[in-house]
A protein has these predicted regions:
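Extreme N-terminal starter segment of soluble prokaryotic enzymes
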Residues: 1-5
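Glycine-rich phosphate/diphosphate-binding loop of Rossmann-like nucleotide-binding domains
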Residues: 6-23, 28-29, 153-224, 236
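Buried hydrophobic positions in well-ordered alpha/beta secondary-structure cores of metabolic enzymes
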Residues: 11-14, 67, 134, 176, ...
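Generic secondary-structure signature for well-ordered alpha-helical cores
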Residues: 26, 30-34, 65-68, 97-104, ...
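N-terminal beta-loop-helix "entrance" segment that forms/cooperates
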Residues: 33-57, 228-230
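Glycine-rich phosphate/nucleotide-binding loop
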Residues: 45-48, 231-331
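N-terminal glycine-rich phosphate/adenylate-binding segment common to multiple enzyme folds
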Residues: 49-159, 245-247
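Glycine-rich phosphate/pyrophosphate-binding loop and the adjoining helix
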Residues: 138-139, 143-183, 187-188, 193-195, ...
Length: 357
């Protein structure tokens, strides 16, 4: 198989994890007889420094021409003082919208080898934590109208709107049901229907979809209760589907109960097979250039790309199994280090995973 991958190296420590990820992809390509072509695309702080824009059209075009996009992480203190439209994170929003990616999928799973690192009580962890958050990605308050104006008394007032159309809810809701059907057949829709009209519209659309999936156990939960249940009883969840902002917050919360944000990949998909694959963590500017950042989440994101965009399940399994074997051997990066284990840096973890493929 021959595939073209757009590579966004990202900012701060991000190029370090992307470098290790490409080493792993090259190893997989060599072992299984594939060819992966890489095209560098600038976004975020790198693009701001080069072009004065977090995502110029010519860089977006590179991503649109590729079979999928691999991203490290963008942002950092250097660009924090810029206006909102010029910040690195705005490039990511444009990329998602430009690629038509409306479904972000983030697993929350505790690797058995890292269970002691979870902040949850051992008896809660022992019940098993393995759920997926399906987050609507290009609607809601992040893409609604934003306004700041001055009232008659001179006080400033800001307004952000949370628009959703039925078709936007239906397509992400259907992904939620289809994903649950392939897993343990349980779906929880998270909203705030006791307050928000958009959430009540979500419920009406989800109720219509529910009739098409009688084999999926469907429930609804307010977002504040869900935030509590994720730390109180996470084993109850299989698939959670929710709107953009709620999903952003809940998936970050869920990442912390796993013990290390450096182990969690994500995928963003639309109607076709092309997707955007990235770790959920940030660019870690405080440790940039020190060869200590954990590359595993980015490497596992590449495994998701092989599985979901390229249909290469065996190759994806090879990467995931290699990571598991490395953890079995007690090899850790600093973020999930524990007594009796061997601490390695970013390149050392890359070496260890390569050795197991």
């Amino acid at each position: 198989m021959e595939k073209n991958i757009a590579v966004i190296w990202g900012d701060c420590s991000s190029p370090e994890i992307v470098k290790q990820t490409l080493r792993v992809l090259d190893k997989v390509a060599e072992k299984y007889g594939h060819t992966f072509h890489y095209t560098d695309a600038a976004m975020g702080g790198e693009a701001i420094d080069k072009y004065g824009d977090p995502l110029p059209q010519h860089e977006l075009d590179k991503c649109l021409a590729a079979d999928s996009v691999l991203l490290g992480a963008v942002g950092g203190p250097k660009w924090e003082g810029l206006p909102g439209e010029q910040r690195p994170e705005k490039g990511l929003l444009r990329l998602r919208a430009g690629m038509g990616l409306y479904s972000n999928n983030r697993p929350a799973k505790i690797w058995p080898q890292l269970a002691p690192a979870s902040p949850l009580k051992p008896e809660i962890v022992a019940q098993g934590i393995d759920f997926l958050i399906v987050r609507e990605l290009i609607g809601g308050v992040y893409f609604g109208a934003h306004e700041t104006h001055t009232l008659e008394n001179g006080e400033k007032q800001a307004i952000d709107s949370m628009p959703y159309a039925e078709h936007e809810i239906e397509r992400i809701g259907r992904i939620g049901f289809e994903t649950a059907r392939k897993r343990r057949k349980k779906l929880c829709c998270v909203d705030k229907a006791n307050v928000l009209d958009t959430s009540r519209l979500w419920r009406s659309v989800m109720h219509r979809l529910q009739a098409e999936y009688p084999d999926v156990a469907y429930i609804e939960m307010f977002v504040d209760n869900c935030a509590m249940q994720i730390v109180k009883n996470p084993a109850q969840f299989d698939v959670i589907v929710t709107e953009n902002m709620f999903g952003d917050i809940l998936s970050d919360e869920a990442s912390m109960i796993t013990g290390s944000i450096g182990m969690i990949p994500s995928s963003s998909l639309g109607d076709g097979t092309r997707g955007l694959y990235e770790p959920i963590h940030g660019s870690a500017p405080d440790i940039a250039g020190k060869d200590i950042v954990n590359p595993t989440a980015c490497i596992l994101s590449a495994a998701m790309m092989l599985r979901y965009s390229f249909g290469l399940a065996e190759e994806a399994d090879a990467i995931e199994n290699a990571v598991s074997k490395v953890l079995d051997k007690g090899i850790r990066t600093a973020d999930n280090m524990s007594d009796g284990c061997t601490c390695v840096g970013c390149s050392g973890m890359g070496d260890a995973i390569l050795a197991e493929i």
